[in-house]
Amino acid sequence: MKIILVNNRFKENTEKKAQEIAGQLSALNVEVIIDNGLDEPYAGTVDFIMVLGGDGTMLRAARRYGQRAIPVLGVNMGTVGFLSNIEINELAEYLPLILREEYSLEARMMLEVAVFQQQSLLTRVFCLNELLLRSNSPRMLSFALEISGQKLEPYRGDGLIVSTTTGSTAYSLSAGGPIADPQLDAFIVTPVASHIINKRPLVVSPEREISLHLLEEREAIIGIDGQIKMDFGAENRVLIKRAPHPLLMVNLKAKPFFTSIDRSLQRQ
């Protein structure tokens, strides 16, 4: 068996814990690859990915490995663990189940984001939570949204979020978007501080494609899962669609979504 341990190199406790777990697994004849984000994603064949950290580390792991149909387990060592299934102090209890592959998988839809300059593709990124288009200055943006070729009336405001249902409890929620069942495949389109009062969040079929471009020359940026940022101008266009493969999230124990999210939000 070969396992990738993904950790956060900016947090010393996850670096140390990754080395400790790697030693334990090696003693059980498990080959271990440690990924702290410095190098390119490991390209070889692996059986399992264990993510040590919080939601940010899980989002990075999803971008790097989510399109390879490898089971991914989130082990929470951070303050926010919406995407984790177990806590670090539970790992010893559940490790035998991992090695025997006795767990269930939950498929989470991911986004495929393609950014163009005129007709040329600049970059293609996969993400689990959301794409954000927002102004990079105090001025509002004016931008166009198309859904599978259907042109909507122009938007004006601070920006727009296109999220998965997994991402519905992240930035989209704070902007007034709905909480969506993560087992549902859909796009959640949420305006950010819309200047047009009747622009409401949309729930869109994953079979559609969403296109965004600016209507004026403004300083804008695109953010991917809160971790990747790129400049976005009037000559750019972004196309969002469902990624070819979902993220396969490992469930070792029951973690009821609506009960968990309700408790988490009540504590905030």
UniProtKB/Swiss-Prot annotation:
> Which top EC class applies here?
transferase
UniProt keyword terms in alphabetical order: ATP-binding, Cytoplasm, Kinase, NAD, NADP, Nucleotide-binding, Transferase
Q: Which residues bind NAD(+)?
A: 55-56, 60, 129-130, 156, 158, 169-174, 193, 227
GO cellular component terms, alphabetically, are: cytoplasm
Q: Indicate where this protein resides in the cell.
A: Cytoplasm
Q: Which GO terms describe its molecular function?
A: ATP binding; metal ion binding; NAD binding; NAD+ kinase activity
Q: Name one GO biological process term.
A: NADP biosynthetic process
Q: What are the TM regions of this chain, as residue ranges?
A: none
* Entry similarity comment: Belongs to the NAD kinase family.
Q: What does this protein do?
A: Involved in the regulation of the intracellular balance of NAD and NADP, and is a key enzyme in the biosynthesis of NADP. Catalyzes specifically the phosphorylation on 2'-hydroxyl of the adenosine moiety of NAD to yield NADP.
Name by which UniProt lists this protein: NAD kinase
Biological source species: Syntrophomonas wolfei subsp. wolfei (strain DSM 2245B / Goettingen)
Source lineage: Bacteria, Bacillati, Bacillota, Clostridia, Eubacteriales
The gene behind this protein is: nadK
